[in-house]
Amino acid sequence: MSSYYARRPLQSSGCSNSDSCWDGAPIEITESGPSVAGRLAALASRMTIKPLMTVGSYLSPLPLPLGFVDFACRVWRPGQGTVRTTINLPNATAQLVRAPGVRAADGAGRVVLYLHGGAFVMCGPNSHSRIVNALSGFAESPVLIVDYRLIPKHSLGMALDDCHDAYQWLRARGYRPEQIVLAGDSAGGYLALALAQRLQCDDEKPAAIVAISPLLQLAKGPKQDHPNIGTDAMFPARAFDALAAWVRAAAAKNMVDGRPEDLYEPLDHIESSLPPTLIHVSGSEVLLHDAQLGAGKLAAAGVCAEVRVWPGQAHLFQLATPLVPEATRSLRQIGQFIRDATADSSLSPVHRSRYVAGSPRAASRGAFGQSPI
């Protein structure tokens, strides 16, 4: 059992299916660590990735071959017995991942919709395969990871459309909202929260949200002014200048009603009907700002929000599973949260008439196949 230090008392079950949060404040827990392996991983990130981020931030106006990152990660082969299937969406693809022993995505049980990070400009199912494979096992669930369109060629709105299409694909398989957990890391945390808010317009409420080292606010200033900008093992301050420029350029290319796409800030639209939310974040990274700000806004609105802070780790240290013990521990905790959040949902497939081919909604989103996967 992991040890931790709670900044405030923890409810016996933490955040689960409850729509309320204890006395309107988020639960925040500081985990033990870092281990020697965690320290070494953070040092390696500081010595290699952070300098590359610094150089890349100066070269951001140039067309950088960022798609190579996910392509190169194809060498990370899935573990023995892991099943990966490519799913075609209207404007993108996704990969359905099942760890050994996990049932097919047939509308029964639970399912995780995973939105990868990478500053909206890079990465994909291959770069995040270790996290997704492990999460499928710990959550005892299929995981659908979306290879959404990236900026600056496409806009954030287009990326969110792809995530929404993936959610509709799961609904077409027979999953009900209370069987679906939205999860994302870094920029994928932004997409997970924004998707949950878009689903509110359809009166759909997923079982829960999981955000790992999440970027929840596009505004760069608060992060650049945060004390952790000096201790972050991955992001230099200038990286957020580059990200802001990329996002603006992408929005300008996507005209909506004759004007550039509006930039959407999810934290400005928090409502009490959002699902319970679990956030894992490093205590040394600058995105601790977004994690704590987001949890505070959720809790103030009456949404159960829990933050687990991991001291001394690199951004998205979960990628280092199983080499870093805290990475495995974090993913195991997330898997337990997902199982708890979906424990009350019925495990039988449901009527799919709203989503069958030929219905107005299916026609507008594209028809999806129904074969077992």
UniProtKB/Swiss-Prot annotation:
Activity versus pH: the note is: Optimum pH is 7.5.
Q: Which reaction does it catalyse?
A: a carboxylic ester + H2O = an alcohol + a carboxylate + H(+); a 1,2-diacyl-sn-glycero-3-phosphocholine + H2O = phosphocholine + a 1,2-diacyl-sn-glycerol + H(+)
Q: Name one GO cellular component term.
A: extracellular region
Query: According to the lineage, what is the superkingdom?
Result: Bacteria
What UniProt keywords apply to this chain's record, in alphabetical order?
Answer: Cell wall, Hydrolase, Secreted, Serine esterase, Stress response
Q: Which SUPFAM superfamilies match?
A: alpha/beta-Hydrolases
Please explain, per the UniProt entry, the way this protein's activity relates to temperature: Optimum temperature is 35 degrees Celsius.
Q: What happens when the gene is disrupted?
A: Mutants show reduced ability to grow in a mouse lung.
Q: What induces it?
A: Induced by acidic pH.
Checking Gene3D superfamilies in the record gives: alpha/beta hydrolase
Q: What is its EC number?
A: 3.1.1.1, 3.1.4.3
Q: What is its main location?
A: secreted
Q: Where is this motif: Involved in the stabilization of the negatively charged intermediate by the formation of the oxyanion hole?
A: 116-118
**Which residues are annotated as active site?**
S186, E285, H315
* Propiece residue ranges: 1-7
Question: Where's it found, cell-wise?
Answer: Secreted, Cell wall
Substituting E285A results in: Loss of activity
What GO MF annotations does this protein's record show? carboxylesterase activity; phosphatidylcholine phospholipase C activity; phospholipase C activity; triacylglycerol lipase activity
Among its keywords, does the record have Kinase? no
What does the UniProt function comment say about this protein?
A: Hydrolyzes short-chain esters. Shows maximal activity with triacetin and p-nitrophenyl acetate. Has no enzyme activity on triacylglycerides or p-nitrophenyl esters (p-NP) with long fatty acids (tricaprin, p-NP caprylate, or p-NP caprate); experiments performed with enzyme missing the first 97 residues. Has phospholipase C activity, making 1,2-DAG phosphocholine; experiments performed with enzyme missing the first 97 residues.
Tell me its family.
Belongs to the 'GDXG' lipolytic enzyme family.
PANTHER family, A to Z: AB HYDROLASE SUPERFAMILY PROTEIN C4A8.06C, ACETYL-HYDROLASE LIPR-RELATED
Q: What is the official name of this protein in its record?
A: Carboxylesterase/phospholipase LipF
This protein's species is: Mycobacterium tuberculosis (strain ATCC 25618 / H37Rv)
